Amino acid sequence: MYTFSGSKPTQLYMDILSTVIKEGDVLAPRGKRIKEIRPVMIEFKNPIRRTTFLKGRNINPFFQVAESLWILAGRSDVGFLLDYNKNMGQFSDDGVFFNAPYGERLRFWNRSDANNFIYNPLDQLRDVYEKIKADPDTRQAVAVIYNPLFDNINNDTKDRPCNLLLSFKLRNGKLDLSVYNRSNDLHWGTFGANLCQFSTILEAMATWLGVEVGSYYQITDSLHVYLDDYGAKITEDIQKVYGVNLETDEAPVVEDFEELLDPNPRMSYTMNELNQFLNEYFGIVDSLMRDDETYMHDGDCAQMLLNQIRHEPDEYIKVTLLLMVAKQALNRGMKDTVATAMNWIPLCEIKVSALRFLYKSYPEYINQYDLDEKLMKYIRREE
């Protein structure tokens, strides 16, 4: 078994990539060549740090936070995610719903919008919360994603879940989360989505319980990179930027800027408060945020929306919403609204990732920042 452990996710990313390239077996499931190591356990010792800074790897942080909010709300709709990542529609069978959305599985187990099915839906996250509240030492705080009813071979779908099960343990005053996974693409799964998704769920649950965040463990039976498509170019770009051949060279030490950045914004909402916020957001605010009219007329409505968000009491939610407004404004070429939203975000990891994403579109705005030269080189992609 391969094991990796650390508190610096960027270095973990590089170390794991190096191991996959050096030691992975070449296979071709569905006719697509991969290099694979298995089984693998990754321990993220400080999962509040959910942003990575590998040069040569450009991650969409706007999508990461929007998808995490979408999961917490138990959503299954494709349309919401398309505003933050236009490629997500390829994983839906009908272009309307996903077959195996993590949020719907976790918060409305036994409901499937894609399959027009509902039978006594269960909020598994509330079940986990109640079990730990009743018995802090419990070993029964489990939430299941894989559902044979919809994920069997006879359901011809593009979307079967890679992540299967979540297991929470409260130990020594800290909440740990272990996620069990059948298949994990290193670039698009582990570090492109899962670290952000599941560390956010872990932080939410720890906040509801009033305990500290512990470790996040990702246990997978196939950790891989693609050799010809999907993430193949990402692997090539990373090796080129760092001047290494990971088949023969040692993994380099990589920069993560920890000492230059403010602490990441933290959640504060209780479970009931977050549920109320999510109901209000998706019931009222989301349609306003995604409406073209909001960003017209010199952006007056967008400015009003930003002013409301600025007074959001939960710092994590506030930063998430500011990033979402910035992406909506970016989609419509509203530079001033993008700048206003970004200026109200503290200089934390997710902001640096967002500035890097924005640089090609708005270099003149980004260059106004007076930041450490190492940060500015990363943001400008001077690699």
Swiss-Prot record:
Enzyme class: transferase
E.C. no: 2.1.2.-
Catalytic activity from the UniProt record: dUMP + (6R)-5,10-methylene-5,6,7,8-tetrahydrofolate + H2O = 5-hydroxymethyl-dUMP + (6S)-5,6,7,8-tetrahydrofolate
GO BP, one annotated term: symbiont-mediated evasion of host restriction-modification system
Key words, A-Z: Host-virus interaction, Inhibition of host innate immune response by virus, Methyltransferase, Restriction-modification system evasion by virus, Transferase, Viral immunoevasion
One Gene Ontology molecular-function label: thymidylate synthase activity
Keyword Protein biosynthesis: no
Pfam families: Thymidylat_synt
Function: Catalyzes formation of 5-hydroxymethyldeoxyuridylate (5HMdUMP) as a step in the pathway that replaces dTMP by thymidine hypermodifications in the viral genome. As a final result of the pathway of hypermodification, hydroxymethyluracil substitutes for a subset of thymidines in the viral DNA. These modifications probably prevent degradation of viral DNA by the host restriction-modification antiviral defense system.
Name used for this protein in its record: Deoxyuridylate hydroxymethyltransferase
Organism: Bacillus phage SP01 (Bacteriophage SP01)
